[in-house]
Amino acid sequence: METKIKKQRSLYIPYAGPVLLEFPLLNKGSAFSIEERRNFNLLGLLPEVVESIEEQAERAWIQYQGFKTEIDKHIYLRNIQDTNETLFYRLVQNHLDEMMPVIYTPTVGAACERFSEIYRRARGVFISYQNRHNMDDILQNVPNHNIKVIVVTDGERILGLGDQGIGGMGIPIGKLSLYTACGGISPAYTLPVVLDVGTNNQQLLNDPLYMGWRNPRITDDEYYEFVDEFIQAVKQRWPDVLLQFEDFAQKNAMPLLNRYRDEICSFNDDIQGTAAVTVGTLIAASRAAGSQLSEQKIVFLGAGSAGCGIAEQIIAQTQREGLSEEAARQKVFMVDRFGLLTDQMPNLLSFQTKLVQKRENLQHWDSESEVLSLLDVVRNVKPDILIGVSGQTGLFTEEIIREMHKHCPRPIVMPLSNPTSRVEATPQDIIAWTEGNALVATGSPFAPVAWKDKIYPIAQCNNAYIFPGIGLGVIASGASRITDEMLMSASETLAKYSPLVLNGEGLVLPELKDIQTVSRAIAFAVGKMAQQQGVAVKTSAEALQQAIDENFWQAEYRDYRRTSI
C-alpha cells in the first residue's frame, strides 16, 4: 500500500521562551530556525547551530549507545520523550528493532517495578481513589483537549509481574508510544491513565519511595463504582474516545470489557489484541503449510482471560472456514494449573465454561490420573499447535515438546508469556527438541536461533502488529464501537503480510520495518468493516483511505508562527 505523506502546515502557537522549550509536544531544541528563535524569544537560549531532526537523532543515537543496561536506555528514551516528543519518535522509528523492546516489553516490566525510584517527570493522569469525587476536575486538567486514544490500567496484573500499583503507569505510556511509532497516531491525541486503587504488594507499601496511595486495593462494589465514575467522566469529556483497558486482573478484565464495550468505544488488548495477533499468526502459519486453521488441533497452557480470549477468536475463525461451532470447540483444549478443563470441573469461571471438553469423550484416553496434565493432553490429542499463556517459566518441558513432535512433523509452538523471564520455553530449546522442525513465535523478543549450522528467525507475536492499526482505523472511520468482526479483519490483514506466506520463507510475521505499512492496511480493513457493521458512517474506499492518510502523524517538525493566547 502506498504511503502518502501529507504536507505539514504551519502551526500557530502562543508560547515562547523557556515555556516553549519545556513543552515536549512543541519543543524542537536546536532545530528552531533563526527566524523562530527571534519570533519566540529564544535567541541566546540555544547553541548557535540550527540542526535538522536527523542530526539531532544521530546525536541521540550515539548517546543511547553509551548506556550499558536496558533499563538505563529506557530511562534515557523516556527523558527524550518528556523533552522533545517529535525527536523521540523520529529516533524510535529510525531504530525500531532495537528500541521497541526497550520502550515496551520486556524492559518496561523492570521500569514498572522501579517506577517510583526512576520517576522523573509527570506524564498522563493519576486518579486515586482518594480523589474519586474530583474525577471531572482531574480530566479537565488534561492540557490536550482533543484526546482520541486512552490506555488505562489499575496496575494489578502488569505483564507476568503481578501487582505494581501506580508503577503500572509504565504500561499505558509504553503502549501509547507504540500507537504513535507504529500506527501514526499523533501523541497530542493520546492519554495514559492509571487508576490508583491501592496495592496489595507489601513490598511497595513498605517502600518509602512509593508514590501511590498506600492502602490495600479496594474491591467489589467500591472498585466497580470507582471504575464506572471514571468511564462516565471520560464519556463526558471525550465522548468519541477509544478506550483501551490494559493489564487488569483476570477477575476484573472480562467483566469490565463486557460491561463497557457497548457503552463506549473500547477493547481489552490483553484479551482481544493478543487474540487478534495470535489468530493472524496462526492463519499465516497454516496457509504457509498449505492448510487452514480449521484443520489444526490446538492445546493451550493457561486458561485465564487472555488464553480464553485467544481460544474464542480461534473458534470464530475456524467457523468462518466452515466448521460448526461444536466441531470448532472440539479442536481446542484448555489446560490450567488444575489440568484439562472438563465439564466435571468445579468452580469454573464464566468465560471458561464454553471451552471445556466433555469428560465422557475422554474415557479412551491413555491416562491413569483423574487430573489430566499438559503431557497427558499432548500425548492423547496429538496437537498441531501449542500455545502458552500461563505466565510461568519452563512449563513446556523437553518431554512435552518431544511428545508433540513425535506426532506432528512441523509443530507450531507459541510461548507467549511476558516478560522473557516468564516464557514457557525458550526458542533455543524448542528448536533443539524438535530437530529444527518447529515454527516458533514468542510473546517477547528473542534473537534468531543457531542450530546445526542453520539460523532460525523467531517471530515475536507482538500486539503492536494489531492495536496501532485498530486505533488508526477507529479514528479515521469515526467508529463508535469495536466489534469482533473488526478484530477478525485485523487478523486476516496481518496474515496477508506474512513473509512466509508471500515468499515461502522467512518470518511468519512481517519485519518491524514494515509495521507502519501493516498498520495502515489494518486501519483500512478495520474502518471498512466498521462501516459494514454500521458502527461508522459509510464512505467510499477512497474517502476512508484519505482519512487514514490525513490522520497519520509524521515525526517531522512544523514551521511555527507566533500568535497571542
Curated annotation (Swiss-Prot):
A divalent metal cation binds at E246, D247, D270. This is NAD-dependent malic enzyme. HAMAP family: NAD_malic_enz (MF_01619). Homotetramer. Divalent metal cations. Prefers magnesium or manganese. Belongs to the malic enzymes family. NAD(+) binds at R157, D270, N418. The record marks D270 as: Important for activity. GO terms for cellular component: cytosol. NCBIfam families: PRK13529.1. The active site is at Y104 (proton donor), K175 (proton acceptor). It comes from Citrobacter koseri (strain ATCC BAA-895 / CDC 4225-83 / SGSC4696). It comes from the Bacteria. GO terms for biological process: malate metabolic process. It catalyses: (S)-malate + NAD(+) = pyruvate + CO2 + NADH; oxaloacetate + H(+) = pyruvate + CO2. Its cofactor is Mg(2+); Mn(2+). Keywords: Metal-binding, NAD, Oxidoreductase. SUPFAM superfamilies: Aminoacid dehydrogenase-like, N-terminal domain (SSF53223), NAD(P)-binding Rossmann-fold domains (SSF51735). Its EC number is 1.1.1.38. GO terms for molecular function: malate dehydrogenase (decarboxylating) (NAD+) activity; metal ion binding; NAD binding; oxaloacetate decarboxylase activity.
